[in-house]
Structure formats: C-alpha cells, structure tokens
UniProtKB/Swiss-Prot annotation:
One of its GO terms (molecular function) is zinc ion binding. It comes from the Eukaryota. It holds the Pfam family zf-B_box. This is Zinc finger protein CONSTANS-LIKE 2. GO terms for biological process: chloroplast organization; regulation of flower development. Zn(2+) 2 binds at residues 59, 62, 82, 87. It comes from Arabidopsis thaliana. Belongs to the CONSTANS family. The keyword Aminoacyl-tRNA synthetase does not apply. It is found in: Nucleus. InterPro entries: CCT_domain, CONSTANS-like, CONSTANS-like_Bbox1, Znf_B-box. Residues 278-320 form the CCT domain. GO terms for cellular component: nucleus. Keywords: DNA-binding, Metal-binding, Nucleus, Repeat, Transcription, Transcription regulation, Zinc, Zinc-finger.
C-alpha cells in the first residue's frame, strides 16, 4: 500500500480498491469503489454503461471520503466532516464560500489519465530549451524569489498557455492558490513527476529577471508564472490568527455626500418648447383668463335668508341678550313718559 502525504492527524491516504497500489482520486457511487486515475479510466472505458457512471472527487484533506463541497477560497474539495471541522476553526474561515460538488463526467475523468502525447510534448520542450538557452548553468547561483527564468530567450506567452492547460483545464490537478493568507485547509498535493519537474527545470535557467533589456511582456503571463511557482512551492497554507487585523479593505467606503446625491430626488429635465408650442400655450392661457368668473356664488340659501332677518346693531349682528336688554330699556322709557312721574321723588 502506498502512503501519501499525511495531514496533521497523521492519517493514511485511502488506496485504490482495484490495484491496491496507488492512492484513490475519485469515488464511483454506482460501483461503491474508490479508484485511482488509471483504474478509473480503464474500468469506465470498458462499455457504454460503465462510462455513464457518476464519479466524485475524493476529499483533499482526509483522502478517505468522497468530496461534497468545493471551497473557493482554498480551492479544495472537502467531504462533509472535513468541511465542518475546518470552516469552524475561526471567524475568517466561516466566511469562506462553499458550493456543492456536481458529479464528474467521463471526459473530465479520462483527461486525468497519462498519455503518450504529453510525454512527447515534454521531450520537445526540453529539446527546444536546450537549443534556445546557451549555457544554462552559468547563473545558477543568482536566485530571485526562489526561481529564475530568462526574459531574453523564454517565450512567456507560449509557456503561460501550456501552464494554463495544465492547471486550469484539468479538474483533477491539485493546486493551491495564493489568496493573501486566506487558506486554512491543509491540502495533500500530488506532484506530477513529468510537468512539475519540467517546470522547475525551466524556472532555474540562471538568467537574471529584469526589464532593463527593453522587452515588453504581457502582465497576464507574469501572473501565470507566479501562480505556477506558488503551486510547486506551497503544499499547505494556514491562516495565522494575527493576520486577520492586517487585512486591508480594497473598496473604500462611500461618502455621505455621494449617498445623499444618489438617494435624492431625480433632477427634472427642462423641456425645450418650439415657438409654435409656446404661442399655442399663451393663447390657451388668454382664453381661460377671459372666461374667468369673479362674482360670488351663494352656496347656502338658508343662511342668506336668515342673515337678512337677523337683528343688527350698528350694522353688525346682535346677540339675543343685547336685543332683549335694549327692548326693555326702550319700553321702560316710554312708560315713564306716559305716567308723568319718575321713580325718585324730587323735593
């Protein structure tokens, strides 16, 4: 039984149920079997029924259970148990985005099998490198960030395209992305003996890295080289707790003035009128002004009738108490004038 790279708990990688000599990479639910890449391609290519079997990747953490979730931050396929254990370690890990893993098709599984074409391409690349790079062992001692490559002779565009086909198109290539220290999943990466060794040889070419030669290269090609270098040099990435406070916000906060401008009422666009439309509006306004009525309209006829018979004092409406007191005073004065004597006797 082959022992793969173990994680912190020291567990063994599950062996293939068919050959018992290689580590399993996929799990076939129809056969209830863990298979390596070679056995999976051989077994499921036997007939059409077997080629339609759905397979899922094996967990990259424990390598003993089928994967159920894909963590985008760590670029790792995890089973249910490992997903719950790893993403409950700290608050930063809980914010990782995970998506369910769909069963793999036969084409993607067959792409993992080694082919003679890849070996021939590797030999061609080595032969071309030997012709293009004279004396590749002169500047081996000059290192830059752990790897060296030539900017005068190395075709970065062609090399980056081959690295893209190796690390992006193949779904089963184990790689570790650099997310600024955001990875917390201990991955057990299987290094390919053909492509990774060749990439390390191409990196250690011994030519100083710099742009003083005047050559202009695509930025995407340089990013691909940095990405492939991190793949070959990093197997485990763990987030320290102290780095959580060092994370900088890439998107600045929106100011209050900008929010007020966005949330305010929409600006009204002034409508431009033609001379004919303006003249027509002026004529309509003048016609309405001529037919305007200024006389008062009587809304309540009963109130108007009561106001006409209501008693008034000096033009104003009088209350009943005032009218009664005035009537008594008039009646008493008339009575005294008729009798001829007053109330108070005079001496």
């Amino acid at each position: 039984m082959l022992k793969e790279e173990s994680n912190e708990s020291g567990t063994w990688a599950r062996a293939c149920d068919t050959c018992r000599s290689a580590a399993c990479t996929v799990y076939c639910e129809a056969d209830s079997a863990y298979l390596c890449t070679t056995c999976d391609a051989r077994v499921h290519a036997a007939n059409r029924v077997a080629s339609r079997h759905e397979r899922v990747r094996v967990c990259q953490s424990c390598e003993s259970a089928p994967a159920a979730f894909l963590c985008k931050a760590d670029a790792a396929s995890l089973c249910t148990a490992c997903d719950a254990e790893i993403h409950s370690a700290n608050p930063l890990a809980r914010r990782h985005q995970r998506v369910p893993i769909l069963p793999l098709s036969a084409n993607s599984c067959s792409s993992m099998a080694p082919s003679e074409t890849d070996a021939d391409n590797d030999e061609d690349d080595r032969e071309v490198a030997s012709w293009l790079l004279p004396n590749p062992g002169k500047n081996i001692g000059n290192q830059n960030n752990g790897f060296l490559f030539g900017v005068e002779y190395l075709d970065l565009v062609d090399y980056s395209s081959s690295m893209d086909n190796q690390f992006e198109d193949n779904q089963y290539t184990h790689y570790q992305r650099s997310f600024g220290g955001d990875g917390v999943v201990p991955l057990q990466v299987e290094e390919s003996t053909s492509h990774l060794q060749q990439s390390q040889q191409n990196f250690q070419l011994g030519i100083n890295y710099g742009f003083s030669s005047g050559a202009h290269y695509n930025n995407n090609s340089l990013k691909d080289l940095n990405h492939s270098a991190s793949v070959s040099s990093m197997d485990i990435s763990v987030v320290p707790e102290s780095t959580a406070s060092d994370i900088t916000v890439q998107h600045p906060r929106t100011t209050k003035e900008t929010i007020d401008q966005l949330s305010g009422p929409p600006t009204q666009v002034v409508q431009q009128l033609t001379p004919m439309e303006r003249e027509a509006r002026v004529l309509r306004y003048r016609e309405k002004k001529k037919t305007r009525k200024f006389d008062k309209t009587i809304r309540y006829a009963s109130r108007k009738a009561y106001a006409e018979i209501r008693p008034r004092i000096k033009g104003r409406f009088a209350k009943r108490i005032e009218t009664e007191a005035e009537a008594e005073e008039i009646f008493s004065t008339s009575l005294m004038s008729e009798t001829g004597y007053g109330i108070v006797p005079s001496f």
